[in-house]
UniProtKB/Swiss-Prot annotation:
It comes from the Bacteria. InterPro entries: UPF0637, UPF0637_domain_sf. It comes from Levilactobacillus brevis (strain ATCC 367 / BCRC 12310 / CIP 105137 / JCM 1170 / LMG 11437 / NCIMB 947 / NCTC 947) (Lactobacillus brevis). This is UPF0637 protein LVIS_1261. Belongs to the UPF0637 family.
Amino acid sequence: MYQDQDFQVFEDQTLAGRLGKIQKQIDPKFLITAGDLEPVLAELSVPIYQHVSQHRRRTKNPPTDTWIAFSTSKRGYKMLPHLEIGFWDDRFFIWLAVLQEAKNRQGLLGQVQLADVLNLPSTFECGNDHADKNCGRPLTLTNYQALMREQVNRHAEWQLGRNFMRGSDLFTTTPDDQAAIIRDTVAALLPIYRQLIAD
């Protein structure tokens, strides 16, 4: 489903052109992924709502990335722990994120069990800035502890997930295998997401 040619939408340097290509080529695939993830997200036992990026604030420069987010609110996701799946011009990403807009960010992150974080596969990364495609670092104890120390800063962010670079096997495998990789990645993050949204 997701293919190398999907990255070509970012070669259009006009706002209208890139938005049109995103809406026509990528957004429908995001919705298919959302449907495919419904059984996985149902394991959280709370309603999860999808939010396809609209890029409404863009008036001049075309978006440098595009995504679909999943959160516990119909109204939005940036102020809540959420899952984000999307594209930069050179990679496909799957992140569990707590952004700077989140209420009580440090309190939420205090609910996360370190053992569960370190049990994630070695292909996972941690990051500190959703607006920086290069923010991901290997998910090691040292890197994760450094990420947690940053959380005292007002504008700190927290991400766990995976990046799949353009040209990687994800884009040459069968659609079924690709969907399974995405499902497995999200499923691996669910125990931590569950901790973040616990009352």
